[in-house]
Amino acid sequence: MAKYNEKELADTSKFLSFVLRHKPEAIGIVLDREGWADIDKLILCAQKAGKRLTRALLDTVVATSDKKRFSYSSDGRCIRAVQGHSTSQVAISFAEKTPPQFLYHGTASRFLDEIKKQGLIAGERHYVHLSADEATARKVGARHGSPVILTVKAQEMAKRGIPFWQAENGVWLTSTVAVEFLEW
């Protein structure tokens, strides 16, 4: 595996998140319904847009991402963001899964008033993202300010017919979390 510095890896990961989750049209690529992009086309379009991108750099980002944000297709010809999409091009068909008793959501304290009114909503994304452990939720919340960890009564939600899915990187997904299922 080629050597890249942390800034280059972080910048490339952010770029991939942007085009594979939110704005593929920004560089002229099209994602299929499952979020897959042809790697050769991605590299070509990224380079045309002035972004240094190679297969070796992609391999390193995919292999070293602590959150496993990206995955390759079984034939190695396509790449996708595992979850977190806001683009209407993508509707990944995750398998429904029974959640553990509790899941966790990390947020910033400045968002609590709104959450107390409307619960957790997906916003521009397709799903609300939840963690199986508090440590991961804390890291997520810290990205946006002073972190607050909310406990989600996931099994209670599932018993009421609210579906959950789990992305291949372990992130739990659901469409919304009503206030009644949150513990502060």
Swiss-Prot record:
It comes from Escherichia coli (strain 55989 / EAEC). Belongs to the KptA/TPT1 family. This is Probable RNA 2'-phosphotransferase. One of its GO terms (molecular function) is NAD+ poly-ADP-ribosyltransferase activity. Pfam families: PTS_2-RNA. HAMAP family: KptA. GO terms for biological process: tRNA splicing, via endonucleolytic cleavage and ligation. It is an enzyme of class 2 (transferase). The keyword Transferase applies. Keywords: NAD, Transferase. PANTHER family: PUTATIVE PHOSPHOTRANSFERASE, TRNA 2'-PHOSPHOTRANSFERASE 1. Removes the 2'-phosphate from RNA via an intermediate in which the phosphate is ADP-ribosylated by NAD followed by a presumed transesterification to release the RNA and generate ADP-ribose 1''-2''-cyclic phosphate (APPR>P). May function as an ADP-ribosylase. The gene is kptA. Its EC number is 2.7.1.-. The lineage of its organism: Bacteria, Pseudomonadati, Pseudomonadota, Gammaproteobacteria, Enterobacterales. NCBIfam families: PRK00819.1-1, PRK00819.1-4.
